[in-house]
A protein has these predicted regions:
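Conserved active-site-proximal phosphate/metal-binding subdomains
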Residues: 152-171, 177-298
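Active-site entrance/lid segments in N-terminal catalytic domains of soluble metabolic enzymes
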Residues: 1-165, 169
Length: 298
């Protein structure tokens, strides 16, 4: 059985986290992931208001008692909204916080006082060192090829590098869409696999059907790494990007651009169908166990 200390600590059946994805991760995904034995998550900002976020948390709590996570984008969120969202995480006893874009120090202290685990995403050793100094419980190593905002270092270099240098649990992010990649990530030293793109093509995901089908139909060469959407380098599906420069301010023309420009990682290469999350997890872990057993046999 594939199992890691962090997986057991969090009470998960499988070493997988469904990564929080802007606009499309939702409460339905969180519950489906929880029931499938993995850690589901969503950005708090996917709820338009703190009141809507409260409703989402209440809906989740009414349907599962299993672990889940909330992503707080601490450096990009209005301070009043961030404070309101964090307070709701405490109120509903969210067990895991996933923090990004900023210094997590003050949030780690508060979260630990409430019994929460905190994992922070990084793309470099420098940022990893700062996060460890802040007291996080683990690092999300976002490698090249990951969907959304991603780094430039291959996960094959980044994960073992951060594992050796930082001495804290590592969550591997980038190009994990099937069981082979789960086994490879664990072999590199990751304790959990941070999977986003594969779950876009799930029935529970909030993405529109055309987005899901584009993930199925795309290959790695259809993914573009650019900073022209938000000013921060990220991976997007080439077919959804407008031609030419986006303008000097790099800002979306209202919310519409964010809904029309679709993110995905190079892991689209291993996405071949749209399935319920429970089936995706079952297939992924069956393949992972088969691969691990085959390697053990030699």
């Amino acid at each position: 059985m594939l199992s890691t200390p962090l997986q057991r600590k969090l009470g998960l059946r499988h070493p997988i986290v469904a990564a929080p994805m802007f606009l499309i991760s939702n409460k339905e995904m969180i519950v489906a992931c929880a029931e499938a034995g993995i850690l589901g998550s969503m950005p708090s900002l996917n709820a338009r208001t703190p009141e809507a976020f409260r409703d989402d948390l209440a809906w989740i709590r009414a349907r599962t008692d299993r672990p889940f996570a909330i992503n707080l984008t601490i450096g990009l969120t209005d301070p009043a909204r961030l404070e309101a969202d964090y307070a709701l995480c405490e109120e509903f006893d969210v067990p895991v916080l996933l923090t990004s874009y900023g210094n997590p120090t003050s949030w780690v202290k508060r979260a630990h006082a409430h019994g929460m685990q905190v994992f922070h995403d990084v793309i470099s050793l420098h940022h990893g060192q700062k996060a460890v100094a802040a007291g996080v419980d683990g690092i999300i190593a976002v490698g090249a090829g990951a969907g959304g905002h991603a780094g430039r270092i291959s996960p094959f270099a980044l994960v073992p590098w951060l594992k050796e240098a930082l001495g804290v649990p590592i969550l591997a992010a980038g190009c994990i869409s099937d069981g082979r990649q789960v086994v490879a990530s664990l072999a590199l030293g990751a304790e959990l696999c941070y999977v986003g793109t594969r779950f876009i093509a799930s029935t529970e995901c909030g993405a529109v059907d055309r987005y899901k089908q584009m993930v199925v139909d795309s290959g790695p060469e259809d993914v573009v790494y650019t900073d022209r959407v938000s000013g921060i380098h990220a991976n997007f599906l080439k077919a959804t990007l407008p031609e030419g420069d986006f303008g000097a301010d790099r800002s979306p023309a209202g919310a519409k651009r964010w809904r029309d420009i679709w993110s995905a990682g190079q892991g689209v290469a291993q996405v071949h169908d749209i399935l319920p999350i429970a089936q995706i997890v079952e297939d992924m872990m069956r393949e992972a166990h088969d691969v691990a057993a085959g390697l053990a046999r030699g």
